[in-house]
Amino acid sequence: MNVSLDQRRAQYAWEKAQEAAQHRVIDEYTNLSKSVASLIMNSGLMQTLAFLQSKKDYQHKMLLVHLTKWLGRTLGGTPVNEGERFPHEPVADFQLVLAALYNSPSDLYMRATSETMALLRWIRQFADARKTLEEPS
């Protein structure tokens, strides 16, 4: 059975919402995932990743890891420039992803931004849905 990229995004987002709930930061993670999309649109992907890296709160670090690992999963191995490739998921961290982004051609940077926004749409929805499971009936 072939699974679409959007289905893979949905599965990944649900797993990450579950992780945030297990670490008891689902409320903060939900709010952050909603604001990060706007931040990307206003400031750009690299600036937003740097913002998440600069914060000490667990939910900021968690979302940063989720986004960089996803970019590694979907873009890993893509040529960035001569002899350099986008890092694969197991090693994709803030520093490696940032280096790949600032060395990448504009079409790859736009693709990374679009992919991040598409994932965030799922994360926002699933984090919000997962949050309601935590609320008393």
Per-region residue spans from a language model:
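Small/polar/charged residue-enriched interaction surfaces, especially the RNA/DNA-contacting tracks
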Residues: 1-137
